[in-house]
A protein has these predicted regions:
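Residue-level recognition of well-ordered beta-strand positions that form the cores
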Residues: 28-30, 56-58, 95-97
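A short glycine-rich, His/Asp/Glu-containing loop-to-beta-strand
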Residues: 3-40, 46
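Alpha-helical membrane-targeting segments
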Residues: 104, 108-183
Length: 183
Protein backbone atom coordinates (compact mmCIF):
# COMPACT_ATOMS: atom_id res chain seq x y z
CA UNK A 1 0.00 0.00 0.00
CA UNK A 2 1.28 3.45 -0.89
CA UNK A 3 -0.24 6.78 0.05
CA UNK A 4 -0.17 10.19 -1.58
CA UNK A 5 -1.02 12.74 1.11
CA UNK A 6 -0.97 15.68 -1.31
CA UNK A 7 -3.52 14.09 -3.65
CA UNK A 8 -5.67 12.18 -1.18
CA UNK A 9 -4.99 8.83 -2.87
CA UNK A 10 -4.10 5.40 -1.53
CA UNK A 11 -3.05 2.62 -3.91
CA UNK A 12 -2.79 -1.10 -3.23
CA UNK A 13 -1.05 -3.27 -5.81
CA UNK A 14 -2.98 -6.52 -6.32
CA UNK A 15 -0.93 -7.94 -9.22
CA UNK A 16 2.32 -6.68 -10.75
CA UNK A 17 4.38 -7.41 -13.84
CA UNK A 18 6.55 -9.75 -11.80
CA UNK A 19 3.77 -11.57 -9.96
CA UNK A 20 1.72 -12.09 -13.15
CA UNK A 21 4.56 -12.90 -15.56
CA UNK A 22 3.82 -9.67 -17.39
CA UNK A 23 0.16 -10.46 -18.02
CA UNK A 24 -1.79 -8.20 -15.68
CA UNK A 25 -1.23 -5.15 -13.48
CA UNK A 26 -4.08 -4.81 -10.97
CA UNK A 27 -4.54 -2.21 -8.28
CA UNK A 28 -7.14 -0.83 -5.94
CA UNK A 29 -7.33 2.95 -5.68
CA UNK A 30 -8.96 4.98 -2.93
CA UNK A 31 -9.52 8.71 -3.50
CA UNK A 32 -10.77 11.09 -0.83
CA UNK A 33 -13.57 13.53 -1.69
CA UNK A 34 -12.01 16.51 -3.46
CA UNK A 35 -8.91 14.40 -4.16
CA UNK A 36 -6.64 14.54 -7.19
CA UNK A 37 -8.05 14.89 -10.68
CA UNK A 38 -5.94 12.61 -12.86
CA UNK A 39 -4.79 14.61 -15.89
CA UNK A 40 -5.73 13.39 -19.36
CA UNK A 41 -3.29 10.69 -20.44
CA UNK A 42 -2.94 7.63 -22.63
CA UNK A 43 -1.52 4.16 -22.19
CA UNK A 44 0.26 3.52 -25.51
CA UNK A 45 0.40 -0.26 -25.21
CA UNK A 46 -2.23 -1.25 -22.64
CA UNK A 47 -5.96 -1.57 -22.34
CA UNK A 48 -7.22 -0.32 -18.97
CA UNK A 49 -10.44 -1.36 -17.27
CA UNK A 50 -12.04 0.13 -14.17
CA UNK A 51 -14.58 -1.37 -11.76
CA UNK A 52 -16.23 1.07 -9.37
CA UNK A 53 -16.40 -0.51 -5.91
CA UNK A 54 -17.74 2.49 -3.95
CA UNK A 55 -18.45 6.16 -4.53
CA UNK A 56 -18.94 8.15 -7.72
CA UNK A 57 -16.28 7.75 -10.39
CA UNK A 58 -16.05 10.77 -12.68
CA UNK A 59 -14.40 9.96 -15.98
CA UNK A 60 -13.69 11.07 -19.49
CA UNK A 61 -12.70 8.33 -21.92
CA UNK A 62 -12.16 9.75 -25.39
CA UNK A 63 -15.22 11.91 -26.09
CA UNK A 64 -17.38 10.11 -23.53
CA UNK A 65 -17.76 11.84 -20.17
CA UNK A 66 -19.81 10.65 -17.22
CA UNK A 67 -20.12 9.44 -13.67
CA UNK A 68 -20.09 5.71 -12.92
CA UNK A 69 -21.56 4.18 -9.77
CA UNK A 70 -20.61 1.15 -7.68
CA UNK A 71 -20.84 -2.03 -9.73
CA UNK A 72 -20.18 -0.38 -13.10
CA UNK A 73 -17.23 -1.34 -15.30
CA UNK A 74 -15.56 0.89 -17.89
CA UNK A 75 -12.91 0.00 -20.46
CA UNK A 76 -10.40 2.36 -22.02
CA UNK A 77 -8.84 0.98 -25.23
CA UNK A 78 -5.12 1.23 -25.98
CA UNK A 79 -4.05 4.78 -26.86
CA UNK A 80 -7.33 6.52 -25.96
CA UNK A 81 -7.07 9.70 -23.87
CA UNK A 82 -8.78 9.50 -20.49
CA UNK A 83 -8.96 11.15 -17.08
CA UNK A 84 -10.67 10.39 -13.78
CA UNK A 85 -11.75 12.00 -10.51
CA UNK A 86 -13.85 11.49 -7.41
CA UNK A 87 -17.23 12.94 -8.45
CA UNK A 88 -18.88 12.50 -5.06
CA UNK A 89 -18.70 13.66 -1.49
CA UNK A 90 -17.67 10.28 -0.11
CA UNK A 91 -14.48 8.25 -0.69
CA UNK A 92 -14.09 6.69 -4.14
CA UNK A 93 -12.82 3.12 -4.40
CA UNK A 94 -12.00 1.60 -7.77
CA UNK A 95 -10.30 -1.55 -8.94
CA UNK A 96 -8.40 -1.30 -12.17
CA UNK A 97 -6.37 -3.45 -14.51
CA UNK A 98 -3.80 -2.85 -17.23
CA UNK A 99 -3.07 -5.54 -19.82
CA UNK A 100 -0.24 -6.38 -20.32
CA UNK A 101 1.56 -5.58 -17.06
CA UNK A 102 4.61 -3.34 -17.33
CA UNK A 103 7.18 -2.73 -14.58
CA UNK A 104 7.10 0.93 -15.60
CA UNK A 105 3.64 1.21 -13.99
CA UNK A 106 5.14 0.35 -10.63
CA UNK A 107 8.01 2.82 -11.17
CA UNK A 108 5.54 5.57 -12.07
CA UNK A 109 3.34 5.12 -8.99
CA UNK A 110 6.27 4.56 -6.65
CA UNK A 111 7.89 7.84 -7.75
CA UNK A 112 4.71 9.93 -7.95
CA UNK A 113 3.46 8.81 -4.53
CA UNK A 114 6.95 9.18 -3.03
CA UNK A 115 7.23 12.75 -4.29
CA UNK A 116 3.83 13.43 -2.72
CA UNK A 117 4.95 12.07 0.65
CA UNK A 118 7.89 14.50 0.47
CA UNK A 119 5.56 17.40 -0.37
CA UNK A 120 7.07 17.85 -3.84
CA UNK A 121 3.88 18.04 -5.91
CA UNK A 122 2.09 21.25 -6.86
CA UNK A 123 -1.08 22.22 -4.96
CA UNK A 124 -3.04 20.54 -7.79
CA UNK A 125 -1.01 17.34 -7.38
CA UNK A 126 1.20 17.74 -10.43
CA UNK A 127 4.89 16.85 -10.69
CA UNK A 128 7.46 19.58 -11.43
CA UNK A 129 8.02 19.85 -15.22
CA UNK A 130 11.63 18.66 -15.30
CA UNK A 131 11.00 15.87 -12.78
CA UNK A 132 7.93 14.89 -14.79
CA UNK A 133 9.70 14.58 -18.12
CA UNK A 134 12.56 12.58 -16.56
CA UNK A 135 9.95 10.19 -15.17
CA UNK A 136 7.94 10.09 -18.40
CA UNK A 137 11.03 9.26 -20.46
CA UNK A 138 11.48 6.18 -18.26
CA UNK A 139 7.84 5.08 -18.19
CA UNK A 140 6.67 6.15 -21.67
CA UNK A 141 5.64 2.60 -22.53
CA UNK A 142 3.12 2.79 -19.64
CA UNK A 143 1.84 6.37 -19.69
CA UNK A 144 2.04 9.57 -21.71
CA UNK A 145 0.20 12.86 -21.30
CA UNK A 146 -2.55 13.49 -23.85
CA UNK A 147 -1.04 16.87 -24.64
CA UNK A 148 1.09 18.28 -26.08
CA UNK A 149 0.91 16.14 -29.24
CA UNK A 150 3.14 13.05 -29.26
CA UNK A 151 5.38 14.49 -32.01
CA UNK A 152 6.10 17.51 -29.83
CA UNK A 153 6.67 15.29 -26.78
CA UNK A 154 9.12 13.21 -28.82
CA UNK A 155 11.02 16.35 -29.83
CA UNK A 156 11.03 18.21 -26.50
CA UNK A 157 10.97 15.62 -23.74
CA UNK A 158 14.44 14.12 -24.40
CA UNK A 159 15.99 17.61 -24.23
CA UNK A 160 14.06 18.56 -21.11
CA UNK A 161 14.80 15.17 -19.51
CA UNK A 162 18.52 15.67 -20.08
CA UNK A 163 18.29 19.07 -18.38
CA UNK A 164 16.30 17.50 -15.55
CA UNK A 165 18.88 14.76 -15.02
CA UNK A 166 21.63 17.42 -15.01
CA UNK A 167 19.69 19.13 -12.20
CA UNK A 168 19.57 15.89 -10.22
CA UNK A 169 16.10 14.56 -11.04
CA UNK A 170 15.70 10.81 -11.49
CA UNK A 171 12.90 8.56 -12.68
CA UNK A 172 13.35 6.35 -9.65
CA UNK A 173 14.63 7.11 -6.18
CA UNK A 174 15.85 4.44 -3.80
CA UNK A 175 14.12 6.13 -0.87
CA UNK A 176 10.75 5.67 -2.62
CA UNK A 177 11.39 2.07 -3.69
CA UNK A 178 8.90 -0.25 -2.09
CA UNK A 179 8.85 -3.98 -1.76
CA UNK A 180 5.75 -4.67 -3.82
CA UNK A 181 3.36 -6.99 -2.01
CA UNK A 182 0.42 -8.36 -3.94
CA UNK A 183 -2.65 -10.13 -2.69
Amino acid sequence: MIESPQTGETLIFRSTADSSNGELFRAELFVKPGGYVVRAHIHPSQEESFVVLAGKYGYQIGDRKGVAQAGETLVCPVGVSHSQWNAGDSPLRIYYEHRPALTSAEIFFETQFGLSRDGKLSPKGDINLLQGVVLLQEVGDFIRPSSPPVALQNALFPVLARLGRMRGYRARYQKYALPIETE
